[in-house]
């Protein structure tokens, strides 16, 4: 086996394969989202937050716009990360912060949309109660609770994200306790393993989702269909190698490096070997004995027999946080809110049909339904890909089809951040009047407090000035 020398460590990023179509599409989507979303959401924040009269609806959509604006602020880092093909030059703090912002946008948006749906449902079915209890202060309190829950849901991303540094190459990924799970393992291998043919794919987008394991046979390491696999590093308290080798070893969060025993591609940390060799301080099986010296790479992929990865057993140590994060995002951030919203809007439609008021011109209801629809269209691919990567077999044909679209689904989810301002403009008033309408007028029409009247409202409402004025809160 040819030894690894310093010359092989000088692989230039520009010498790697050209971007795949999925990478180019992701960069285009993210760039357009940033270019359109920042001014669009910024304008809505300024007008709705400063120029417009404060109402319950403006509070809802103001906080929703704030979540979108924060997400758009993080997108330039994601685009640069994609261009750099996995290299993360921004340090440990932003490695934790940027992926957390993307997840923050998801949870804040879905929770606020759920609150808006419940609010609209109550206005249709309990109009008198809403006139007496629905207020701007209550809306602010609900939004405050939404942000608290949202930050709690982002804690796992902030805690488990870590920075792996090998020489001058940094990778931002997930770190589950004593094992290191990192995205973009193919480029880390490609940078240090010159004898292996370079992969035909490229990576880069910040993956805010934990990636499942990839126990790929050695012959398939460089033909994987995606680079959004994780890289798992397992360390041992005992150092079977010389201290000189530490200079080549990866280290985490800028801390001094620990000696790397083995490098195995896969999203789930490798805790044990079926032959129990880890208990004796050795990671590799008896028939695999690659050496690691100061002038050698961590491990050559072709040193692993084809059946070596089949001998690995993944511990529950990382399975628990990884699957828990994926499932919690699906259930709390998608399924439960989706069920609540479908129920609310179904009840609204049922009441409107029952009272023969299907042509009621409730502008805010139309805006809310449109925003909810766009949100779920953008985020459905993200959750589908995440679940499929968890449940599919490592060598299944379905997995090979899904993997190339992993970071594309993240780009599409991020694109949701730029759509809402345009929905407000298109649905607020008749489109033919938009050109002559000021931004304030458009948003006032979109966020109007016009109630969807029901039979009970018509029969029970009091013709008092107080009740009349309370509809504009």
From Swiss-Prot:
Modified residues (Phosphothreonine): 452
Family matches, as Pfam families: 7tm_1
Localization of this protein: Cell membrane
Superkingdom: Eukaryota
Similarity remark: Belongs to the G-protein coupled receptor 1 family.
Subunit relationships: Interacts with VGF-derived peptide TLQP-21.
Annotated protein name in UniProt: C3a anaphylatoxin chemotactic receptor
Organism: Rattus norvegicus
Gene it is expressed from: C3ar1
């Amino acid at each position: 086996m040819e030894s690894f020398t310093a010359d092989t460590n000088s692989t230039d990023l520009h010498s790697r394969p050209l971007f795949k179509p999925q990478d180019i599409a992701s960069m285009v989507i993210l760039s357009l989202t940033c270019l359109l979303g920042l001014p669009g959401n910024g304008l809505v924040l300024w007008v709705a937050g400063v120029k417009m009269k404060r109402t319950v609806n403006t509070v809802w959509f103001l906080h929703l716009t704030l979540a979108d604006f924060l997400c758009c602020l993080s997108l330039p880092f994601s685009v640069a990360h994609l261009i750099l093909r996995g290299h993360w030059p921004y340090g440990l703090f932003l490695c934790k912060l940027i992926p957390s912002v993307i997840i923050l946008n998801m949870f804040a948006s879905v929770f606020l949309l759920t609150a808006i749906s419940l609010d609209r449902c109550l206005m249709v079915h309990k109009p008198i109660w809403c006139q007496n209890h629905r207020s701007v202060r209550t809306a602010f309190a609900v939004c405050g609770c939404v942000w608290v829950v949202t930050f709690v849901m982002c804690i796992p991303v902030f805690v488990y994200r870590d920075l792996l540094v090998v020489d001058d190459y940094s990778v931002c990924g997930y770190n589950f306790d004593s094992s290191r799970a990192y995205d973009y393992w193919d480029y880390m291998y490609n940078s240090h393993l010159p004898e292996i043919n370079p992969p035909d794919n490229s990576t880069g987008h910040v993956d805010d989702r934990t990636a499942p394991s990839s126990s790929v046979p050695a012959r398939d390491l460089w033909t994987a269909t995606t680079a959004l696999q994780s890289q798992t590093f397992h360390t041992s308290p005992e150092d079977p190698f010389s201290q000189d080798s530490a200079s080549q070893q990866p280290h985490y969060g800028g801390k001094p490096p620990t000696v790397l025993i083995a490098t195995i591609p896969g999203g789930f940390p490798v805790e044990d070997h079926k032959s129990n060799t880890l208990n004796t301080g050795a990671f590799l099986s008896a028939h695999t004995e690659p050496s690691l010296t100061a002038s050698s790479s961590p491990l050559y992929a072709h040193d692993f027999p084809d059946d070596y990865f089949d001998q690995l057993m993944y511990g529950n140590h990382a399975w628990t946080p990884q699957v828990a994060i994926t499932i919690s995002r699906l259930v709390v951030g998608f399924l439960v809110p989706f069920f609540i919203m479908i129920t609310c809007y179904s009840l609204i439609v049922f009441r409107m049909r029952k009272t023969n008021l299907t042509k009621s011109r409730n502008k805010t209801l139309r805006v809310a339904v449109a925003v909810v629809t766009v949100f779920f269209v953008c985020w459905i691919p993200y959750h589908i890909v995440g679940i499929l990567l968890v449940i599919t077999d490592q060598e299944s044909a379905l997995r090979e089809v899904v993997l190339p679209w992993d970071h594309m689904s993240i780009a599409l989810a991020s694109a949701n951040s730029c759509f809402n301002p345009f929905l407000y403009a298109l649905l607020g008033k008749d489109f033919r009047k938009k050109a002559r309408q000021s931004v304030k007028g458009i948003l006032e029409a979109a966020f109007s407090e016009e109630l969807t009247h029901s039979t009970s409202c018509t029969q029970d409402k009091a013709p008092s000035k107080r009740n009349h004025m309370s509809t504009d809160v």
